């Protein structure tokens, strides 16, 4: 249990800390958090046969699945693999058929002309790649935010992948926040925007992955993958580039950043800072590891 009085004491301390020391402290905490994330990515890397594009794809789909459908998205990435997606990306409709058919989601939609066309296309793809589709029961489709609905996320991803290949190479080329947003700027068709949420007549949803989610993909997928690859390849330049990108992405605004804010001067400017505060809260404060916390070793920072 977090001691609120202790949090208040440390919050005041951080707000009064010399800016250069706070920057160093937050970078250390940020790197601790990155280490945890890159360990998870390296585990995925081993599970998928040490293939970096598949690793990025699996990590991305799992993140797009959010809390409710992350596991199902991860499973889908192994049914419709990156190699299949990359080979079929010339047609957006083909990618929709491959992803939604493999997910078992196509079967849920009424058989109008477009769905029949996608089902026919998927039958050819399933035979070509020997795909065994998932069950639709693997997915949570009700009582979720429309913008996190798996059908919408998959057709948004299909549109982005059709527009430009989402690969380790294109991720490595991201040096700014705008580069990350551009990577996911493909637009889902009006057809899906009007029909993706079964059981609802009209649902407000974005045609493409927005800047808010784009930032979170940068924080939780792109940057950790670049760090993992940089460590694996012993490429310090790539690690430095990932850190520069992290400084480009603004701070998250969540309960952790709010908890540590003191006064009117924000202490969390970039995602380096907000991720550092998450690491501080989850690893040290919530486990009462005050003696192990870097704040107690602040005098060692120069």
PLM regions: where:
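Compact, glycine/acidic-enriched structural inserts
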Residues: 1-21
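Hydrophobic, aromatic-lined core segments that form the binding pocket/scaffold
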Residues: 30-274
């Amino acid at each position: 249990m977090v001691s609120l009085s202790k949090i208040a004491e440390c919050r005041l301390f951080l707000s009064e800390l010399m800016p250069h020391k706070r920057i160093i402290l937050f970078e250390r905490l940020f790197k601790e958090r990155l280490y945890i994330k890159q360990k998870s990515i390296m585990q995925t890397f081993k599970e998928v046969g040490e293939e970096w594009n598949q690793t990025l794809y699996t990590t991305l789909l799992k993140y797009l699945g959010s809390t409710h459908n992350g596991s199902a998205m991860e499973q889908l990435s192994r049914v419709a693999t990156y190699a299949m997606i990359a080979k079929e990306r010339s047609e957006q409709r083909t990618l929709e058929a491959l992803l939604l058919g493999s997910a078992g989601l196509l079967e849920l939609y009424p058989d109008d002309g477009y769905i029949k066309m996608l089902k026919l296309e998927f039958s050819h793809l399933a035979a070509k790649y020997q795909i065994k589709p998932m069950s639709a029961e693997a997915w949570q489709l009700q009582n979720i935010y429309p913008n996190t609905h798996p059908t919408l996320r998959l057709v948004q991803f299909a549109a982005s992948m059709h527009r430009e290949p989402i690969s380790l190479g294109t991720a490595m080329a991201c040096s700014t926040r705008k580069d990350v947003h551009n990577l996911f700027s493909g637009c889902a068709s009006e057809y899906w925007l009007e029909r993706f949420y079964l059981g609802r007549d009209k649902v407000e949803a974005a045609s493409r992955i927005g800047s808010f989610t784009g930032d979170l993909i940068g924080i939780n997928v792109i940057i950790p993958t670049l760090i993992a690859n940089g460590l694996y390849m012993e490429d310090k330049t790539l690690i430095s580039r990932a850190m520069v990108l992290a400084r480009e992405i603004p701070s998250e605004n969540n309960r952790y950043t709010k908890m540590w804010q003191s006064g009117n001067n924000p202490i969390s400017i970039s995602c380096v800072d907000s991720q550092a505060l998450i690491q501080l809260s989850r690893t040290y404060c919530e486990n009462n590891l005050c003696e192990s916390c870097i704040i107690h070793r602040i005098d060692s920072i120069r």
